[in-house]
Amino acid sequence: KKAFMSDGRLSGKADNVSPDMEKQMTVLAYSDNLGKVNGKTVSGHLLIGYDDLYAIQYFNDNRMAYWKHDGQTDIFDAFAKGQKEYAGMMKRCADFDRQLMQETAAAGGQKYAELCALAYRQAISAHKLVADKEGNLLFLSKENFSNGSIGTVDITYPSAPMFLCYNPELLKGMMNPIFYYSESGRWNKPFPSHDVGTYPQANGQTYGGDMPVEESGNMLILATAIAIIEGNADYAAKHWDVLTTWADYLKKEGLDPDNQLCTDDFAGHFAHNTNLSIKAIMGVAGYGKMAGMLGKKEIADSYLATAREMAGKWISMAKDGDHYKLTFDKSGTWSQKYNLVWDRLLDLNIFPSEIAETETAYYKTRQNKYGLPLDNREDYTKSDWILWSACLTGNTADFETFMLPVWKYANETTSRVPLSDWHYTSDGTQRGFQARSVVGGYYMRLLEKRLKK
């Protein structure tokens, strides 16, 4: 370091490093002489890459990273192409940066844009991109800082808004492994698996607890969202049989879920979950919506009617004065009903708009300095779900009321880690989780603007 500071040259040897330290602490140093510094801008760049040889084991088949094109491209080809196309790529990056900041600011204000910018890279980088033998895209998430599950459905679900906005093919890549797992007969339960393994081995579910209503609702809702974004239900048509199985499961078991896990599994099992029930109703309605898009009118009418019947029962079972309960059997409780956001965004229109308005008004009485708690049981929250709850009514003032404390948390938290989605609302400190893809859910407001323009 001292030599470099004096003459700008690297000696090739690190200062005061013992042989043992050298084994443990590999150091790479690089210098580039940019000439005399004056008023004119001078820049340089360095290409750094990593070849993991095989990225993912997918049902006992080792798959290379997508960029390698089944071995037709190696790391040296990638470096050469990167160098050749450097200027153009940097311009594309800068152009997209501007686009993202402009359209998210237009959707929700400058502070919302800053939250989205903070989330963008993290939401993508928590995945590996590969293809299966047939060339189907697989965009496999890792559950960072929880249990390391790969391809978790209830990680895909909260992250989806960003990918629906910018690249629905990547969302399909998250869903493809779950469809394959069921359609291949490897998973034979009447609801989707929770995951397809433990990173980096996607050989089948390893998580100890199923989430039957949770994952069925997630897959049906996301398939519906893709259909609306693309203007057709072709993707759903490819998987219609298994989607039908899941929709029928929700018709039977979804209105008043038994003692099972949902995506907020850190809070433990509990029965009669009203927000989970909404997810089931949205899943049934979504199936009906897709059936209509596929010309299956009788099926569409039947499932949409069932969803409305379920919603009517939900209202009478969940009502608790000026709000709606956490669980059907416990008065004096409350929770964020973030799953309700899809009713308006996907034009399902199953619930009266008064439900969202009533809940939103009540949430304002429960908000803390750094956000709205997840429910009445704890002070902590999930910031991705807050950004969904903020979109329940479509009202700009309501959105800002709930979004701004999340920005304040991200800006002021003393937990200086890759953005945590699970924090305490009273003091803004991390409760757990970090560097996870679920922050793609921050893009719900942008998705709303795109769907409702």
What would you call each of these model-derived segments?
Residues K1, E143-I155, P161-P168, W187, ...:
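Extended ligand-binding clefts on enzyme/binding-domain cores
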Residues K1-G151:
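Acidic/polar, glycine-enriched structural segments that form the non-catalytic walls/loops
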Residues K23-M25, A29, T41, H45, ...:
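Generic recognition of stable, solvent-exposed alpha-helical segments in well-folded globular domains
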Residues G49-D51, R98-A107, Y157-E169, N218-D234, ...:
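Well-ordered alpha-helical scaffold segments within catalytic/enzyme domains
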Residues W67-M90, G148-P257, N273-A291:
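Aromatic-rich carbohydrate-recognition surfaces in CAZymes
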Residues A78, L115, E169-Y181, M219, ...:
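Extended, well-ordered alpha-helical scaffold segments
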Residues A113-D132, G151, S184-S193, D210-G217, ...:
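Aromatic-lined, polymer-binding surfaces characteristic
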Residues P405, S420-K453:
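Terminal, non-catalytic domain-edge segments
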